[in-house]
């Protein structure tokens, strides 16, 4: 007859701390790295932009020149020599235009003059006016701004046009609006010019948008055209990871060109700065930048949301680093500011549970409960209940797997009475505690003593049911007791067989009589006893 191996029950941890995901901040453009965030001044425009932004349209030509040079990155004290050079170009372009018979010819001659004498070579990132003056390198934005200034100098109405990837000018001459693709010497009224069509795309890499293609072109004023210098410079800075500097340009743009578009551009730059700081795991810097921006631009909903997201991610980072108290404090501030925010509430509960676990891992369950109690007012009832269940679970597992039987049962009873575990979990613990002890005794061969321990566990669960607690267990203790008794019967049968097979029928009968005294009525032992007695009677 074979033995049935008893199943040793082991109580495992069922509940662990939740892993909270970061709320990702999407970069509008550019890689996620850069220089450290400066002081709050990154939200302030450079001197001169606010003053120019307050000037009504149209600006006079000197102010427009000043705006273009400031947007190009020159400091106020650097402007005079560049403005003098710019004035000279405007005067010379005007002199060349005087030879034209009408406004159309004059406007075209200005473009011809600039390409012959100033604009040397196209380069995509050559977006500043001082860059043109110093090197002759230009792109669509800088050449359009220079043309705008020069044609304004001869009194012709001019405006800007922007598309998704390009900028140019229009002039009002001869009673009609004429496109001027300033990157190309043949760019005046370019639609029918073969020379323009052959060279434009090859030179710039962009597609010309004809006047009828209004879905991808938008008229902008002179001020907005100058603002594109700032926009381009910011994009270049972000591509090299210099997000704080790009954010300063966003402030300049918003000051120079007040309105929804420039404000959206500024907020995008702030978003990218915060996202880049988070990508470098500088969560303190990200929170500081987002909060400073939200305070400096009150009423901007995107910035309020950005500040909340940055603070949430800071709390998540603290929890991931195991700084549970700091994580809880940060999460509690968030939850207090946004009581209906489920993510913040979950983070409060998770960080409090994590703090409790940090005590529990050291076996300091009293300290864990004390830490929970100290923070109960800020955490709220749900978070407290969750954290206490974590502590109860940890203590229960430790007791079930490490304490003697009586102490382990007492701990389980207390944890259940404190409401830190459910009746079903209590039943699992009782089964594990009694099952482990029964298996330990059974391993020494005392099968019936082991079965008696299992029976005590079954009785314990029965008392729990009678007391109104639904903790009936899964029947594993009953199965274990049955296995242990089967092993007792197997042992007794094998002893009987040894006596019987050696012809010692008296010894066989004595062994069975003793076994039946412990398990009266067992059918296997009863049959064996009958066989021994039959052999003795022959």
Predicted regions and their residues:
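Long, intrinsically disordered low-complexity tandem-repeat regions enriched in serine/threonine/proline
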Residues: 458-461
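A structural boundary/capping signal
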Residues: 34-374, 385-397, 401-410, 417-439, ...
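Ala/Thr-enriched low-complexity intrinsically disordered regions
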Residues: 2-5, 469
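Bacterial N-terminal signal peptides that target proteins for export
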Residues: 7-21
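Bacterial N-terminal signal peptides
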Residues: 19-29
